[in-house]
């Protein structure tokens, strides 16, 4: 299906260079990009609905970053505000039967639970079906861990190595076994 990537902190030249390094000169009409979008509650909802109507085979929308689409507010962000924002995006994804990936930043300070390092309140995670947290020990490291939590899957930690040639992350190993659907007990008999 079609993928929409809202690269709201990039420009088209950077995207073109990145795609060329990742995939060569071959393109696809299934991957769409935008470098600007309206805010949630101020037109983004309509933009995304229009995209889905024009591309009914859409399966994934990536919004990079959440902060760029947040409603403009003079109020400090609260748990309720964060929960409402993610809740609106989740309702949109559920209604359209797509996966929505919201990219967000982490704080610099360490925390007992790595997911507490996500910038903002716990409301961001409270409403989401799952979260990925990519971390490196140092900014210049070529190795990282990807911690995954979700409602419908076991927690996982993946160890990755950066592939600078393809600008991707390669899986080294998983600390926990990747999720497998349990066998149907009725089919075993």
Give short role names for the model-derived ranges:
Residues 1-84, 91, 173, 180-184:
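Conserved inter-motif catalytic segment of the P-loop NTP-binding fold
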């Amino acid at each position: 299906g079609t993928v929409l990537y809202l690269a709201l902190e990039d420009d088209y030249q950077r995207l073109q260079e990145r795609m060329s390094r990742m995939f060569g000169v071959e393109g696809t009409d299934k991957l769409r990009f935008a470098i600007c979008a309206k805010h949630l509650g101020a037109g983004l909802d309509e933009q995304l609905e229009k995209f889905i109507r024009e591309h009914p085979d859409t399966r994934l929308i990536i919004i990079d970053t959440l902060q760029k689409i947040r409603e403009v507010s003079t109020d400090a962000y609260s748990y309720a505000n964060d929960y409402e924002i993610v809740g609106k995006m989740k309702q949109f994804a559920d209604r359209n039967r797509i996966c929505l990936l919201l990219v967000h930043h982490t704080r610099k300070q360490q925390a007992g639970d790595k997911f507490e390092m996500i910038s903002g309140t716990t409301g961001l995670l409270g409403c989401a079906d799952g979260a990925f947290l990519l971390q490196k020990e140092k900014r210049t490291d070529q190795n990282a861990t990807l911690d995954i939590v979700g409602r419908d899957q076991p927690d996982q930690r993946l160890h990755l190595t950066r592939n600078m040639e393809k600008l991707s992350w390669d899986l080294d190993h998983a600390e926990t076994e990747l999720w497998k659907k349990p066998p149907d007990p009725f089919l075993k008999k």
